[in-house]
Curated annotation (Swiss-Prot):
Keywords: Acetylation, Caveolin-mediated endocytosis of virus by host, Fusion of virus membrane with host endosomal membrane, Fusion of virus membrane with host membrane, Glycoprotein, Host-virus interaction, Lipoprotein, Membrane, Myristate, Transmembrane, Transmembrane helix, Viral attachment to host cell, Viral envelope protein, Viral penetration into host cytoplasm, Virion, Virus endocytosis by host, Virus entry into host cell. It comes from Gorilla hepatitis B virus (isolate Cameroon/gor97) (HBVgor). A lipid is attached at residue 2 (N-myristoyl glycine). Its main location: virion. Residues 2-170, 264-337, 388-389 are virion surface. Belongs to the orthohepadnavirus major surface antigen family. Glycans are attached at residue 309. Signal peptide: none annotated. One of its GO terms (biological process) is caveolin-mediated endocytosis of virus by host cell. The large envelope protein exists in two topological conformations, one which is termed 'external' or Le-HBsAg and the other 'internal' or Li-HBsAg. In its external conformation the protein attaches the virus to cell receptors and thereby initiating infection. This interaction determines the species specificity and liver tropism. This attachment induces virion internalization predominantly through caveolin-mediated endocytosis. The large envelope protein also assures fusion between virion membrane and endosomal membrane. This is Large envelope protein. Residues 2-108 are annotated as: Pre-S1. The chain crosses the membrane at residues 171-191, 243-263, 338-358, 365-387. HAMAP family: HBV_HBSAG (MF_04075).
Length: 389
């Protein structure tokens, strides 16, 4: 049994094939059968002391192999002391004191000398001390040979860092304005087409608008009268309608601007005073009666009678332009004066009439919204002009 060279015994259960660390069976000599420290098989029945008490470990060692500890012999092996530290000289050493400037840069000691300034007249020597783009003055300042104060570390050198928040807001503001302007422009460009659709729908009540030019001498495919191709006879009428619509929008913006300027007091419109023939605008320095209040804008109108003296009256804060237009139109169109009693009567109506008007507006509101919806993009522009002008 012990001569079986083909049977491995890594755990030491068999008497002739025990694991022996001293024999180095695990490293250089893997042959378990030529272990010189083998026990005879009859001694395996004897009771040995063992490492864990009597009878727990056979004399040959069993699982523990052949070792003094397996035979119950406890030997105290002193531990080797730790090696002396070899890192005592490592780490950051103190910075040595810098040598004097006269030893490291002897040429710096001559910067303030006359010979050095004469040598600077040579472009080749000057290029060594003043590179391209540097100072062009003829005075050179040597580096002092003493260390500067520690507070100089925190001192400013050069231009301060730019404020990124202000730069971002400076770019973000114009971009937002540009985006809002482009959005309003795209919406405004749809106003003529929407008004053109509403205009052409008046000719096709109860049906879909169809271009009437498709059955003429130059027939085209079925299309809307608001999108006629250039070869369609209705193309000229479409351009004419849109031109009128553009003029109407321009007139609307002009009226709003005039009302706004008048409301701000920047449009000196003088109402016609009964009994006066001429009016003029200007400062009230030569007037016999001063206007009430002071403002940076023209705030008074001067009437000049025949005697040469002028009388100043305040310009109304609002609706002066409307009053001027009404008076101007009443002088040239006498029939407009007949509307004044009707307007006064309408303004003095009872609340019941006003409620009926409100109910009618509620009933016709959706249709009015469809008519006025193309003008909604103009409202933000009017609001901005009203606030910032």
């Amino acid at each position: 049994m012990g001569q079986n060279l083909s049977t491995s015994n890594p755990l030491g259960f068999f008497p002739e094939h025990q694991l022996d660390p001293a024999f180095k069976a695990n490293t250089n000599n893997p042959d378990w059968d030529f272990n010189p420290n083998k026990d005879n098989w009859p001694k395996a029945n004897e009771v040995g002391v063992g490492a864990f008490g009597p009878g727990l470990t056979p004399p040959h060692g069993g699982l523990l192999g052949w070792s003094p500890q397996a035979q119950g012999i406890i030997t105290t092996v002193p531990a080797n002391p730790p090696p002396a530290s070899t890192n005592r000289q490592s780490g950051r050493k103190p910075t040595p004191i810098s040598p004097p400037l006269r030893d490291t840069h002897p040429q710096a000691m001559h910067w303030n000398s006359t010979t050095f300034h004469q040598a600077l007249q040579d472009p080749r020597v000057r290029g060594l001390y003043f590179p391209a783009g540097g100072s062009s003055s003829g005075t050179a300042y040597p580096v002092p040979d003493t260390a500067s104060h520690i507070s100089s570390i925190f001192s400013r050198t050069g231009d301060p860092a730019p404020n990124m928040e202000s730069i971002t807001s400076g770019f973000l503001g114009p971009l937002l304005v540009l985006q809002a302007g482009f959005f309003l422009l795209t919406k405004i460009l749809t106003i003529p087409q929407s008004l053109d659709s509403w205009w052409t729908s008046l000719n096709f009540l109860g049906g879909a608008p169809v271009c009437l030019g498709q059955n003429s001498q130059s027939p085209t495919s079925n299309h809307s009268p608001t999108s006629c191709p250039p070869i369609c006879p209705g193309y000229r009428w479409m351009c004419l309608r849109r031109f009128i619509i553009f003029l109407f929008i321009l007139l609307l913006c002009l009226i709003f601007l005039l009302v706004l300027l008048d409301y701000q007091g920047m449009l000196p419109v003088c109402p016609l005073i009964p009994g006066s023939t001429t009016t003029s605008t200007g400062p009230c320095k030569t007037c016999t009666t001063t206007a009430q209040g002071t403002s940076l804008y023209p705030s008074c109108c001067c009437t000049k009678p025949s005697d040469g003296n002028c009388t100043c009256i305040p310009i109304p804060s609002s609706w002066a332009f409307a009053k001027f237009l009404w008076e101007w139109a009443s002088v040239r169109f006498s029939w407009l004066s007949l509307l004044a009693p009707f307007v006064q009567w309408f303004a003095g109506l009872s609340p019941t009439v006003w409620l009926s008007v409100i109910w009618m507006m509620w009933y016709w509101g959706p249709n009015l919204y469809n008519i006025l919806s193309p003008f909604i993009p103009l409202l933000p522009i009017f609001f901005c002009l009203w606030v910032y002008i």
